[in-house]
């Protein structure tokens, strides 16, 4: 039986764990920050985008965990994109591996105190479980306040998805929602009732999403469905041909053509935990072998197929 407690260092000399499930899906998770650097479906197709420019302990792409803060303060007025310099990512923080005995899941933990933490002067426990199912991957996050005082935080999972051609992709599930447009200094707007397509740079924070978002790739004839619990907000980002912004974010000039970032998070209203209180967030990514070319996606259909 394949084991997930075998740690290898062959991804840019970074320790990682391999996950497998009987249907053929696989994933690779770094011990630094619990970053997912590969997720393949049962046909062996890579579903996550990783930039060739990536280097060091923060390879760009995949799925990153951002905690305890996005933006300057976390208040709704000052929410900023998860792609700016104010992101507090866990990518450079080593997590403790707890073998599960199951080759399709892994548990990673981080326990800090206010005195020994370089990332945040608070005492807390963070637990992450990454699990694989048939053409499905789930990420469960658990944060407990072990400090003597209350603290607040925001949280996000940055999902860099591999697409065939960004101009041939559409996103459904964000129609008519309010969003903050970071290309217009955070101006609050309302999305149109149609599916979102791309012909230029996009950097938006959507509030109170319905829990199911579909990324439809016509050329690859597949749909990735993101289902969330406890992560009500979403960030939609593509630098398009803004080479300066792509470079600052750690991507190559042409990376935008085959990449789309659709993030899940708690951004509008930061989580407040009193001592001993806990918070949980859940994300499920699933694959449907269809591009829904016949028309606008029926949310009930997405909800049906996305459920475990």
Which residues are covered by each model-predicted region?
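Acidic-aromatic substrate-binding/catalytic surfaces of carbohydrate-active enzymes
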Residues: 22-83
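Short, well-ordered beta-strand segments enriched in hydrophobic/aromatic residues
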Residues: 27-29, 130, 137-145
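Active-site/ligand-binding surface loops and adjacent short beta/alpha elements
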Residues: 150-152, 160-235
